[in-house]
Amino acid sequence: MQTRNTFSWIREEITRSISVSLMIYIITWASISSAYPIFAQQNYENPREATGRIVCANCHLASKPVDIEVPQAVLPDTVFEAVVKIPYDMQLKQVLANGKKGALNVGAVLILPEGFELAPPDRISPEMKEKIGNLSFQNYRPNKKNILVIGPVPGQKYSEITFPILAPDPATNKDVHFLKYPIYVGGNRGRGQIYPDGSKSNNTVYNATAGGIISKILRKEKGGYEITIVDASNERQVIDIIPRGLELLVSEGESIKLDQPLTSNPNVGGFGQGDAEIVLQDPLRVQGLLFFLGSVVLAQIFLVLKKKQFEKVQLSEMNF
């Protein structure tokens, strides 16, 4: 009897642990995946629209700076660094999905020219691996190896993200040529304001959906508010739901207008995009340039020697 009770207790504990773990996973996934560039994979075939706008801006409404550093030129079949910088104040805290305050995460999407791709691990130097850290990059699509995404990752550790990039070789890829190419980047810090289905997150301002008098503000048990607005002209009631984590700007009995902010703006993050240019350099052209420069240097040396020889001849003639 005691053994049966023990097994029953173990079964209940295992079931409870699985349930709690599943709930944590669902909440975490919902609060993270819908707020970073990696989520665009599920909704957009290409992250860059025809207008040049990167689609991450559809969910991250605030504009913030982002920067990218790449070499001016690279040789074919070589590995180089593309460093994306996402600056922000490390002291800032954002509103999380559970209504609490937490640190900001960052994410980025890097759009390379056709043929450029993520460098394989065996081609990455130890120095570059140290800069990369524990980051794990993904292709935007299996057939789009030139578009890379990363995130969410801790912003305090990865406000600078180093992408290891392998340059293509026109000798093996006939679609690639020795030209100047553009590189586009988008980077965000913090959660988004709009979910892909168009609904708001709890990281944005909530406005009144009707004008009138606030007759009641109900604080919900699990956080958040229900604000009842009564239209004085027809006594129609409207209830606005405010999610947890937001600070109210209104109170009961107050008269408000349509679209008037009910909460303060909690967003401390934002999205930005930038671009850079890189030249895929022909090695023969480099060799030709070096040969030309060497020829110029030798010519200068010979001119100097010839001048000195001429001066010696003149000096000897003057002595006679």
Swiss-Prot record:
GO CC, any one term: chloroplast thylakoid membrane
A biological process from GO: photosynthesis
Bilayer-spanning residue ranges: 286-305
Cofactor(s) annotated in UniProt: heme
The keyword Plastid is assigned to this record: yes
Keyword entries, A-Z: Chloroplast, Electron transport, Heme, Iron, Membrane, Metal-binding, Photosynthesis, Plastid, Signal, Thylakoid, Transmembrane, Transmembrane helix, Transport
Entry annotated with the keyword ATP-binding: no
Cofactor note: Binds 1 heme group covalently.
Protein name as catalogued: Cytochrome f
Phylogenetic classification of the source organism: Eukaryota, Viridiplantae, Streptophyta, Embryophyta, Tracheophyta
